Amino acid sequence: MTRYFLAAGLLAAPAPTPPAAFYTTYSYTGYTVVDLTTGVPPTQVPGVGGTLALRADGTYDKRLSLLMGDSGPRMFAQHGRFTTTADSIVFRFTDLKGPDAQRGTYRYVAKTRRLTITLDGYPTGNKGVYELVATAPATGR
């Protein structure tokens, strides 16, 4: 009998899933680039805008705009699937080069409905940090 309790205790609890309010549309409020190859401090990119829709069915739509100096805003659109495990997030999509994935971590603060996504960059150690806030109250689906 004791070994059954021991075996049950060794089984890991499933990783928590995000709350229902996590699945919504967010507005980008900030983007910081961390480039360890340059020796300069993290750079906050000006003129960040757009939305990120995360759906409970695992699909997402990203529409990001960045102000790129005198050339004006640059628009990025990306559609695909995402998964979360504990604090990890993976975005899978297909672009002109074929299937790809962006990996990183996320932190969701339910009280303020703020989301921070940190995506791994290249070379290893570089990263992009995105700050977002939910655009509307959760629908409770």
Protein language model regions, located:
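Sec-dependent N-terminal signal peptides
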Residues: 4-12
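Lipid interaction determinants
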Residues: 14-77, 85-141
